[in-house]
């Protein structure tokens, strides 16, 4: 079995954000994000070793295979979510929601203010992530929250905006005070990136909307 490996995307590392210091970004990007990349790759090596993760001993209570597959989801989603997070941040923000995105937000959530309030509420309520995404099956925009990278994920949700709510995302700047970090996050959104994600997500929905017959 081939070994799938990931490489960290250094070009996504943001700098000089408003309200989120470079000192905060440094361990977040270099230790946490790159740590998930490294552990995902290590897990792939072990899964490729048929002797290490003996499939014949797979067990729902405990087995090496089960543990590797569980941690594979945690580390892989840790990589993807962090890349989506870092990739949409730019100093002081940029642009605004496109007319198409604003119309969709109005239809599905009740407007940009309502969407912002929902995202902020999810960011306070969930321990890992708050997400605005497009449900690939219904075509609706949905605000979702995760307690960990791999806990409460909605199958088929394409993330457009992701807020990291783990304490490692804000502890250097704000200690245990999450609200000012959330406010700072919204000041640095690159709407050009979000708009592009939305356009691609809608194309994916159009291609897959009859996926479930």
From Swiss-Prot:
Positions with a binding annotation for Fe cation: 28, 82, 164, 168
Gene this chain is encoded by: sodB
Catalytic activity: 2 superoxide + 2 H(+) = H2O2 + O2
Similarity-based family: Belongs to the iron/manganese superoxide dismutase family.
Source lineage: Bacteria, Pseudomonadati, Aquificota, Aquificia, Aquificales
EC number: 1.15.1.1
Temperature dependence: Highly thermostable. Retains about 70% of its activity after heating for 60 minutes at 100 degrees Celsius.
Entry cofactors: Fe cation
GO molecular function: metal ion binding; superoxide dismutase activity
Cofactor note (record): Binds 1 Fe cation per subunit.
Alphabetically ordered keywords of this record: Iron, Metal-binding, Oxidoreductase
Record's protein name: Superoxide dismutase [Fe]
The protein's role, per its UniProt record: Destroys superoxide anion radicals which are normally produced within the cells and which are toxic to biological systems.
Record note on quaternary structure: Homotetramer.
Enzyme class: oxidoreductase
């Amino acid at each position: 079995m081939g070994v799938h490996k990931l490489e960290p995307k250094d070009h996504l590392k943001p700098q000089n954000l408003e309200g989120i210091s470079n000192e905060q970004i440094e361990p977040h990007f270099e230790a946490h994000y790159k740590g998930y990349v490294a552990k995902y790759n290590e897990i792939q090596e072990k899964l490729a070793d048929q002797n290490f993760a003996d499939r014949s001993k797979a067990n729902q209570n405990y087995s090496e295979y089960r543990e590797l597959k569980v941690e594979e989801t945690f580390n892989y989603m840790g990589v993807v979510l962090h890349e989506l997070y870092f990739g949409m941040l730019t100093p002081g923000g940029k642009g605004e929601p496109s007319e198409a995105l604003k119309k969709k937000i109005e239809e599905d959530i009740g407007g940009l203010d309502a969407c912002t309030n929902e995202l902020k509420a999810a960011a306070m309520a969930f321990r890992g992530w708050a997400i605005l995404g497009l449900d690939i099956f219904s075509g609706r925009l949905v605000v979702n929250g995760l307690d960990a990278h791999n806990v409460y994920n909605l199958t088929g949700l394409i993330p457009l905006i992701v807020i990291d709510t783990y304490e490692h995302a804000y502890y250097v700047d704000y200690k245990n005070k999450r609200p000012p970090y959330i406010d700072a996050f919204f000041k640095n959104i690159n709407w050009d990136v979000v708009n592009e994600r939305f356009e691609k997500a809608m194309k994916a929905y159009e291609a897959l909307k009859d996926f479930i017959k």
